[in-house]
Regions:
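P-loop NTP-binding site
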Residues: 27, 31-181
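Canonical P-loop GTPase G-domain recognition
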Residues: 1-44
Length: 181
């Protein structure tokens, strides 16, 4: 009998129950999960992964939060057009110790500014991180195009410093438990 808790970091739902569960005493943590790595690998193989870092610069200040949300909204629109399911899409903007985050956690949800920076900036480091059920090369093309579109609309320029797009390989766990006696 394994307890199942519904927990939301966004709303706080379920945290009281989690604290109560963690406060219990007893012999816990001995159950070894039987993970089917073939099924896991099949699911991972459907995803295109993209990790990128960028440098933006403009002559006039622009609202960092609006830019972050604009990039995610543009990407969400392109994914919807292709019926490409977003498993994870996050754009982070960093400027002089401040940062903001916009994300999309499902194609059924709307893009949101999950952490506002409340900054007007001329330069910013930006990170785009995506896991989408699509071809990784297509994902890279779309990210490049939509970032450029969002940046151009603010009279800024962008330098893509690092971009990696790929499909993950089959997981090979380093440590495994032997069921033994």
């Amino acid at each position: 009998d394994v307890p199942v808790l519904r927990i939301s970091a966004k709303t706080g739902e379920g945290f009281d129950q989690l604290i109560e569960l963690l406060g219990q005493t007893g012999d816990f943590g001995r159950r070894v999960l039987d993970i089917d790595y073939d099924t896991y690998a099949e699911g991972e193989a459907e995803l295109g992964w993209l990790n990128s870092s960028l440098q933006l610069a403009a002559d006039e200040p622009f609202d960092l939060d609006e830019l972050l949300l604009d990039v995610v909204t543009r990407l969400a629109g392109r994914l919807e057009e292709q019926q490409a399911e977003a498993a994870h899409l996050k754009v982070i903007g960093l400027w002089e110790g401040f940062f903001g985050v916009a994300n999309l956690v499902s194609s059924e949800d709307r893009p949101e500014l999950s952490l506002p920076s409340n900054c007007q900036v001329r330069t910013v480091e930006m990170i785009v991180n995506a896991r989408v059920a699509c071809d990784p090369e297509w994902l890279e093309q779309v990210v490049r195009a939509e970032v450029v579109g969002a940046v151009d609309s603010r009279g800024a320029s962008v330098e893509f410093r690092q971009v990696q797009s790929f499909r993950p390989g089959r997981p090979v766990p380093t440590h495994r438990f032997d069921r033994g006696d």
